[in-house]
């Protein structure tokens, strides 16, 4: 709970200190992973009471919001009940909702914590706690996307799409934690968890592909105009309309038991971990699509697909670790872990477009696939024709069955060292390596492939962590992690997926493992007397033999053929700097500045050079392996590279006194992208904003606040995305009742109705711009009530019980969790 939620009469003593991590507190080994916490000592008889708030709101455009939290404190326990529902795209609780589309979020839950009052880490100490949570989101979204794919020879393929969707997702989670110290040297920790989720979805997508920019050809809304457009230069490639709907569910239960024993020698520990999990899931989907190929004399492809994908997974594991002090401030830690994992998955795809042809071959020319789907002929017996309906509609090529049995082992060796100096400085570092042998047995069936594969691999994962604590407010940290990743077993099987008529994929038996190097450097400092602080960070990620999909694009049909391949040259790096300082003798002014600079080098393989030799593999019976072998042999697969720089800056200056707070701010984001294959992929995108804000604290417990900013975008092909938006928000609130613990407020968002949601993204081979719908402009009227009743009967009789606290603004609640120091 924030300090402002607690009346000062409750507090006997307050101190700040660096709380050690769970690992340090249990093992006695200082790992340097502290966090600064406030330790509150509450007056006798005052650790007993209720704290909470209620907030209800309704507004224009049928927007509404309601949330509450009620917290019960006793000497050795804490209970919290929270709940909310809104359709303002605010998920509350941080585990629901979203920012795209229009989302209605519902959540509720209970959190509790209890201990028996024994001193920390003493014999007989027992702690338990947990929570049960429910959340649901219902969303409606509309998206418009313009995409450009970079092709060899200075060419590009352009696609434009519009989509509408409805989604429902709900989750139930239950977590429990039990910790016991049978004696001062032994710690037992048990953590079981359960979760259930289910959802359903519907979407309608309409897209069109061109071999030249439709905007340069004169179209303003390509998706709406392409069907009736004369297309004098024949730039239309295909049009695709697709409907999807489906549902899914998942159940999971897991648990972890940890037993730690501190041995006689300080720093010597033995730890045993046992755990396991079991989950089941299923998803069903139905899709219908129609593709028109304009470069192929009006050829059309219609598909009707039903898919069901049940799966079952379980695993169990054990881990034994031992820590031995070898020198002063130095310990050596070793561990061994073994895990058995089972996964059984099935995908059954039923296709109705192939059924019509099969029935016609038996002389049933008047029975259509759509009639069968609609159930018109469900009661008809086709056995007299020698037809097994279930076999006819099963898409053997795209149905699959896979069973995995994995035996994973991990051997870890870690060296930890700490040096402490008289001036208060500390040096810490740990270095280690994981060796991870793995055996996987897979049984796989798909189309004509029915195989069993056994794979033995060995992964390595080195890591290094250095921390120099320069002072209580300043430190330097350096971290490095190396990771080896193996291709999935399915990616190694050369079997085709033709379920999408415009995107066909296959595996690659020649894939090799990939390697990633990641590093982070962080430095921060804070001058308490001057209230000045800064933080500087740098990071980088280098990928070797990264696995990326190589794409061959057919300019006649708009169809893509994809295969995973190893490729070198993918890396990215970035920096971030933040600075904050108070200004003036009274520290009334505050200056904040931050800047980020990111660079990415994305690589991929692509080709559109389909000569007569290549077309022999796709115009007849599709042969993906032959196609990629031919293109690779002749050097027709070209490496594409997109280099992009992203620069962001923000500056804010505030002035504050008891009456008002006023500020000005400005920011910009610049994206510079260059593609070595297509000059049209060389883009410069700008987003910049500037504005101000004011807060007035009026003498009759009224507060007025407002902010305004000019936000602009530049560099988009679709002129409607190059916007100038003046965003103005305002709020007025009034506290009332004797203790000022009730508030009524009026909020008006986007008063001028100009805000929109637009984004741009890059990869090695394409660029995409996306617009998403949302309700940005509305008025909300809030009624907020807060209460704070702390202290037992004796304390209240002494005059300390009527303490309605000074909670300000909307109380968002949250999931408590733990005692929060000694409160």
Positions of the model-derived regions?
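Short acidic/polar hinge/loop motifs at secondary-structure boundaries
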Residues: 1-19, 75-80
């Amino acid at each position: 709970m924030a300090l402002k939620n607690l009346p000062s009469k409750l507090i006997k003593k307050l101190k700040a200190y660096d709380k050690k991590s769970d690992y340090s507190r249990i093992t006695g080994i200082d790992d340097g992973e502290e966090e600064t916490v406030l330790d509150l000592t509450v007056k006798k008889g005052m650790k007993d009471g209720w704290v909470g708030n209620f907030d209800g709101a309704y507004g224009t455009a049928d927007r509404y919001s309601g949330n509450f939290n009620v917290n019960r404190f006793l000497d050795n326990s804490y209970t919290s009940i929270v709940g909310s529902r809104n359709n303002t795209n605010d998920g509350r609780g941080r585990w629901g909702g979203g920012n795209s589309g229009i989302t209605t979020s519902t959540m509720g839950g209970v959190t509790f914590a209890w201990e028996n009052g024994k001193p920390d880490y003493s014999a007989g100490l027992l702690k338990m706690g947990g929570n049960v949570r429910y959340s649901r989101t219902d969303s409606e979204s509309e998206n418009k996307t313009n995409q450009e794919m970079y092709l060899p020879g200075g060419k590009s393929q352009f696609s434009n799409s519009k989509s509408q969707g409805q989604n429902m997702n709900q989750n139930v989670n239950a977590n429990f934690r039990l910790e016991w110290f049978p004696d001062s040297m032994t710690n037992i920790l048990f953590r079981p968890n359960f979760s259930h989720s289910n959802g359903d979805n519907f979407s309608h997508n309409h897209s069109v592909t061109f071999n030249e920019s439709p905007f340069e050809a004169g179209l303003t809304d390509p998706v709406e105009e392409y069907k009736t457009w004369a297309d004098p230069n024949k730039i239309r490639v295909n049009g695709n309309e697709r409907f999807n709907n489906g549902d899914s569910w998942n159940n999971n239960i897991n648990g972890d038991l940890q037993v730690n024993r501190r041995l006689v020698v300080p720093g010597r520990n033995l730890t045993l971990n046992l755990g396991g999990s079991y989950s089941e899931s299923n998803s069903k989907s139905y899709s219908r699509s129609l593709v028109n190929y304009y470069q192929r004399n009006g050829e059309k492809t219609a598909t009707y697909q039903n898919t069901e994908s049940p799966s079952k997974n379980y695993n169990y594991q054990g881990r034994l670790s031992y820590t031995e002090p070898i020198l002063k401030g130095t310990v050596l830690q070793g561990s061994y872990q073994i895990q058995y994992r089972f996964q059984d998955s099935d995908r059954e795809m039923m296709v109705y477009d192939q059924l019509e042809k099969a029935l016609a071959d038996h002389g049933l020319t008047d029975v259509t696939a759509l009639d069968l789907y609609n159930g018109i002929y469900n009661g008809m017996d086709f056995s007299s024709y020698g037809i097994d309906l279930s076999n006819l509609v099963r898409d053997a090529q795209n149905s699959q069955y896979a069973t995995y049995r994995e035996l994973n082992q991990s051997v870890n060796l870690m060296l930890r060292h700490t040096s402490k100096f008289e001036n208060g400085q500390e040096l810490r570092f740990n270095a280690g390596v994981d060796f991870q042998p793995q055996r996987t047995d897979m049984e796989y069936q798909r189309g004509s492939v029915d195989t069993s594969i056994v794979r033995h691999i060995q992964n390595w994962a080195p890591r290094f962590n250095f921390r120099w604590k320069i002072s209580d407010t300043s430190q330097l940290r350096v971290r490095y992690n190396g990771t080896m990743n193996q291709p999935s077993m399915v990616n190694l099987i050369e079997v085709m997926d033709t379920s999408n008529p415009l995107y066909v994929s296959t595996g690659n038996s020649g894939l090799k493992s990939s390697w990633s190097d990641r590093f982070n450097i962080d430095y921060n400092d804070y001058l308490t007397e001057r209230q000045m602080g800064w933080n500087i960070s740098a990071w980088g990620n280098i990928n070797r033999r990264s696995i990326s999909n190589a794409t061959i694009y057919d300019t006649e049909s708009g169809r893509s053929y994809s295969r995973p391949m190893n490729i070198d040259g993918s890396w990215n790096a970035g920096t971030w700097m933040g600075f904050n300082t108070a200004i003036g003798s009274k520290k009334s002014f505050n200056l904040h500045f931050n800047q980020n600079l990111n660079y990415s080098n994305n690589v991929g393989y692509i080709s559109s050079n389909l000569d007569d030799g290549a077309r022999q593999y796709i115009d007849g019976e599709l042969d993906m392996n032959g196609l990629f072998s031919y293109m690779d042999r002749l050097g027709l697969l070209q490496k594409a590279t997109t280099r992009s720089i992203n620069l962001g800056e923000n500056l804010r200056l505030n002035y504050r006194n008891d009456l008002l707070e006023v500020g000005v701010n400005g920011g910009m984001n610049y994206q510079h992208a260059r593609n070595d294959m297509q000059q049209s992929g060389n883009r410069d995108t700008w987003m910049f904003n500037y504005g101000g804000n004011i807060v007035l604290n009026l003498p009759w417990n009224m507060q007025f606040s407002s902010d305004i900013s000019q936000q602009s975008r530049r560099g988009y092909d679709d002129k409607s995305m190059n916007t100038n938006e003046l965003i103005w928000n305002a709020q007025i609130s009034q506290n009332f009742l004797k203790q000022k613990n009730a508030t009524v407020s009026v909020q008006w968002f986007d008063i001028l109705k100009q805000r929109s949601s637009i984004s741009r993204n890059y990869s090695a081979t394409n660029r995409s711009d996306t617009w998403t719908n949302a309700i940005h402009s509305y008025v909300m009227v809030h009624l907020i009530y807060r209460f704070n009743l702390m202290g037992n009967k004796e304390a209240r009789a002494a005059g300390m019980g009527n303490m309605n606290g000074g909670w300000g603004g909307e109380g968002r609640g949250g999931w408590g969790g733990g005692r929060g120091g000694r409160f």
